[in-house]
Amino acid sequence: MQLYDVVVIGGGHAGCEAAYASARAGAQTALITHKISALGTMSCNPAIGGLGKGHLVREIDAFDGLMGRAADAAGIQFRLLNRRKGPAVRGPRAQADRQLYKEAIQKLLQKQDNLILIEDEVIDLIVKDKSISGVILKKQGILPSGAVVLTTGTFLNGFIHIGDKTWAAGRMGEQSSIKLAERLKSYGINLGRLKTGTPARLSKKTIRWECLPKQQADENPVPFSLLTEKIEQPQIECAITRTNAQTHQIIRENIHRSALYSGNIEGLGPRYCPSIEDKIVKFGERDGHQIFLEPEGLNDDTIYPNGLSTSLPEDVQVSLLKTIEGLENVTILQSGYAIEYDFVNPQQLTKTLELRSLPGLFLAGQINGTTGYEEAAAQGLLAGLNAARKVGGLDEILISRSTAYIGVMVDDLVSRGVCEPYRMFTSRAEFRLSLRSDNADARLTPLAQQLGIVSKLRWECYQKKQQRLDQARSLCQELFLTPNQASAHGLQVNHDGIRRSAYDLLAYPHMSIERLSHIWPQLQSIDSKTVESVEIEAQYAVYLEKQAQDILALQRDERLEIPSSLDVQAISGLSNELKTKIQKISPRSIADAQKIDGMTPAALSLIITYIQRQRREKAKSA
């Protein structure tokens, strides 16, 4: 059997990005999936992006990944969430046509060099000298490889639950990977159990659309990918409805029949995507919960009722749906269900997503305790890239918290672990002013170019974009007004004798290049996309300068090593609780210490000061 550099197990969002990244990095890569026709399937909601998640999609695209381009090709309703808030927390989101999305992913994979797609099931891993050396396939037998990326999603020992019905499955209609789960346990890998759920799918033809308020797409859709010049798909509208007292009563009367509340499910579900049963139990005082009716495609009769995830029996699902306005005569195409699956405690991984106890085995996606397409895809990208570099004898790639949301997520997972499905939010990033969705390519594409995974087309597009931005910034910085001149143009500035540039003025509230172009007509030459970038950059300039200093200080302190001989008890002012935790965990650096639960900036300062003082005293006595 042929030897591959990297074998990727699983064809979901993590697996596709992992295989694509590995192949682009020059590794001979095999992607193993149960069904090639299912590659890129959106198992749950038909949408990409959102708050925090949209940042991840842009970062994947900055590395020349798949997700952004596929979402642009399939997007049928683009919306920028948090539009009225600051640029740092705005979240690009696109509802996608499921079939078009799959087709876009498969097309990109099939034309990628160094990549072969294999339809089979991995039933075992080959371990030699305590390292991964390949996999065993159900049909084709032994497949040697230098590294393996495991992206099992909900398939690892997956079980579907609908009421009191339970059966093994990775998702509806597809088998789970039970033997692989057993094998991982045999290697002493710490596995846990999580669950997620999905709502019933409804027939579009049986919904009373005329009585429901509509949600429109943005008038000017903004693509995810730098390579997308224009969104080609027609933009559709969604409808909004709500549950009501009658709905809630039916759920309460049948709550004991829900798989979630009957004791059949052990794993915790995603906190920020609760089932309708959870909503009624935990937020029973509300008179209704909003439901978004989202078409799954332009030529598809299927509607996804976002907000109605459930594991109630089919008869109860029918009853509760018929109490909701617009759904009185609805037909269910597929029942909602919960799915429970195994995951690996991510604290067992390095920050390259390699398993410490089994070198050569990389994990990405829901197997690491995350939830969401975007989180999975971002992990797949990093794992696939590092797997390829490991086999090629190259340095590992680590992405820091101050560089990207990908770095924030990986650091959270590896340092803190998970007890419930992890979802990305902008609030998780300390340096979110710097980690905006609009500057993902500026942050990451030069790195991707150094790694050799960026196409010639993308690099040219990136350079042209940066050139336009540099020229626009320079123009704004060359145009000045005195306070008196500013007042003459109706601009409110301090009369302090300081001349201010157009760039400086853009930091003022309600200021724009459009307004300043009445003073300086040459600003009209800046194209609309570049205008937005310059305005955001200027608006945040003062804060970004301070944040850059904070990042440098953090990086300097993070690199400070904690000696193994450190006498924690001698550090005055440190709580006994933290002393105990430090002794137990034995952090090797300040970067490790700051992840300890309960650690504060003040406590870190005490540790840093103590270590530096000890070093000075040692140097004097030497």
From Swiss-Prot:
| InterPro entries, per the entry | FAD/NAD-bd_sf (IPR036188), GIDA_C_N (IPR049312), MnmG (IPR004416), MnmG-rel (IPR002218), MnmG-rel_CS (IPR020595), MnmG_C (IPR026904), MnmG_C_subdom (IPR047001), MnmG_C_subdom_sf (IPR044920)
Family, as annotated: Belongs to the MnmG family.
| Record NCBIfam families | mnmG_gidA (TIGR00136)
Subunit structure, interactors included: Homodimer. Heterotetramer of two MnmE and two MnmG subunits.
Gene3D superfamilies reported for this sequence: FAD/NAD(P)-binding domain, GidA associated domain, C-terminal subdomain, tRNA uridine 5-carboxymethylaminomethyl modification enzyme MnmG/GidA
Output the GO biological process annotations, alphabetical, semicolon-separated.
tRNA methylation; tRNA wobble uridine modification
Q: Give the record's keywords alphabetically.
A: Cytoplasm, FAD, Flavoprotein, NAD, tRNA processing
SUPFAM superfamilies in the record = FAD/NAD(P)-binding domain
Which residues of this UniProt protein bind FAD? G10, G11, G12, H13, A14, G15, V122, S177, Q366
The record's annotation in PROSITE patterns points to:
GIDA_1, GIDA_2
Specify the protein name.
tRNA uridine 5-carboxymethylaminomethyl modification enzyme MnmG
* Localization terms from the record: Cytoplasm
For this record, an example GO cellular component is:
cytosol
Q: What cofactors does the UniProt entry give for this protein?
A: FAD
Q: Which residues are listed for NAD(+) binding in this entry?
A: 269-283
Sequence intervals crossing the membrane: none
| Domain of life where this protein originates | Bacteria
Pfam families noted in UniProt: GIDA, GIDA_C_1st, SAM_GIDA_C
Which GO terms fall under molecular function for this chain's record? flavin adenine dinucleotide binding
Q: Its principal location? A: cytoplasm
Stored SMART domains = GIDA_assoc_3 (SM01228)
Is-annotated flag, keyword Cell membrane? Answer: no
State if NAD is listed as a keyword.
yes
Source organism of the structure? Bartonella henselae (strain ATCC 49882 / DSM 28221 / CCUG 30454 / Houston 1) (Rochalimaea henselae)
Q: What does this protein do?
A: NAD-binding protein involved in the addition of a carboxymethylaminomethyl (cmnm) group at the wobble position (U34) of certain tRNAs, forming tRNA-cmnm(5)s(2)U34.
